[in-house]
Amino acid sequence: MMLPMMYIYRDPPLHYGLCIFLDVGAVNVFPIFLQMATWRPSENKVYLPPTPVSKVVATDSYVKRTSIFYHAGSSRLLAVGHPYYSVTKDNTKTNIPKVSAYQYRVFRVRLPDPNKFGLPDTNIYNPDQERLVWACVGLEVGRGQPLGAGLSGHPLFNRLDDTESSNLANNNVIEDSRDNISVDGKQTQLCIVGCTPAMGEHWTKGAVCKSTQVTTGDCPPLALINTPIEDGDMIDTGFGAMDFKVLQESKAEVPLDIVQSTCKYPDYLKMSADAYGDSMWFYLRREQLFARHYFNRAGKVGETIPAELYLKGSNGREPPPSSVYVATPSGSMITSEAQLFNKPYWLQRAQGHNNGICWGNQLFVTVVDTTRSTNMTISTATEQLSKYDARKINQYLRHVEEYELQFVFQLCKITLSAEVMAYLHNMNANLLEDWNIGLSPPVATSLEDKYRYVRSTAITCQREQPPTEKQDPLAKYKFWDVNLQDSFSTDLDQFPLGRKFLMQLGTRSKPAVATSKKRSAPTSTSTPAKRKRR
């Protein structure tokens, strides 16, 4: 009888087993296999680290500021138009534009190229190794015209009941219960400064899933979208930031100035989270309103009140009257003590990584001021009147606005190192192109064809296409262009904002004319006679 032999085998890398062979003379021999535990890879998800991205650094880390400052200011900027809608005559182009206090005023301020600028000191930078840029260190938005509250409204406003005062609720709805209602919108003062347009947000009709059954009259899905704020866009007047032309087909839910418009609200969250911080260096904001009147809407309630929320009534009270409530806003009192304009602001540290550097030699100033929203009424007689007759008098509306922009810019320089140029190209490729810095294309690894007689008609046309002119990426948007290329001056003490800036620095300008102090001459030419002694 032989001893049993044990063999342990390993089948890498997954299975382990144990085999026992018995050899007992003439007795039948059979192997015994004992299956052991089998290792399997984990079925849990493996999370890999995110792909590393380039770190965004502040402009102060690669922009060197100089001690040269310039003042630049605009002329008096005026706008006149109709406060509710644009006026066209004879089906031609617009004769009178829409100018409302509830519109955004977006100024696109164009600055001269400092690299082509006549500098007081030509040794301030090396053009072979450096480039110059502007940094905004101070500004003042001046506003003219008196304080006043302007009204907006709709002669056919959708209101059913005055739900604020006591009234017996009933469901007796006539076909047309629209009324002539006017409101004073939400009071807003706003100023956003950056080198790219400010971003706005509003709600509009969203896309419907293919699996969703939609019938005519259903409430559409909503979608929040972001668009740049343009000059002339309407602000939120108290009825929400939404596309009223798409979402309100009755044309009777809001005042005339926004009934076919889109009201935008600045997307502060998106601009604050901007990686480079170009759209909003800083902002000033003041808003206030209260609900003045309370109405409900006429029309069929699309989503009825659940039956468990009320007890059924009688005498025309079943079903219940309209539960779609709306409040008309009011901007409340306007005072000069809460004004954000007509005062200087100094930029020491921006909220983002861009600390006031004007990339592209431009900056955008987005302004809203409803504290000067007075609408002037103008009346003209159609004929000579001997007594008052309203039928012979035409009434007109006009709104006027007055602005003035003043800035203090600091001259800065950037060293054109390989790291800085790579970073700027990744941030905005147009910057290096504007500085006449080209990047070498990669070396071709494939064989290219080069004809000898490039003007021969025997071969395909080899004429190079003329380079296309550089297109303005913001040409499709509307802005109020303010050209300051000829308005720069180093004589800061000659301008109001410049004197305020010098006072902040603690410096005084030297007198232009030096006056020498001399001893005053005697008023009398004669001298008193000496007394003789006796």
Swiss-Prot record:
Keywords: Capsid protein, Disulfide bond, Host nucleus, Host-virus interaction, Late protein, T=7 icosahedral capsid protein, Viral attachment to host cell, Viral penetration into host cytoplasm, Virion, Virus endocytosis by host, Virus entry into host cell. It holds the Pfam family Late_protein_L1. It is found in: Virion; Host nucleus. Residues 508-534 are annotated as: Disordered. GO terms for cellular component: host cell nucleus; T=7 icosahedral viral capsid. The keyword S-adenosyl-L-methionine does not apply. GO terms for biological process: endocytosis involved in viral entry into host cell; virion attachment to host cell. One of its GO terms (molecular function) is structural molecule activity. Its main location: virion. HAMAP family: PPV_L1 (MF_04002). Forms an icosahedral capsid with a T=7 symmetry and a 50 nm diameter. The capsid is composed of 72 pentamers linked to each other by disulfide bonds and associated with L2 proteins. Binds to heparan sulfate proteoglycans on cell surface of basal layer keratinocytes to provide initial virion attachment. This binding mediates a conformational change in the virus capsid that facilitates efficient infection. The virion enters the host cell via endocytosis. During virus trafficking, L1 protein dissociates from the viral DNA and the genomic DNA is released to the host nucleus. Belongs to the papillomaviridae L1 protein family. Self-assembles into homopentamers. The capsid has an icosahedral symmetry and consists of 72 capsomers, with each capsomer being a pentamer of L1. Interacts with the minor capsid protein L2; this interaction is necessary for viral genome encapsidation. Interacts with protein E2; this interaction enhances E2-dependent replication and transcription activation. This is Major capsid protein L1. It comes from Human papillomavirus 56.
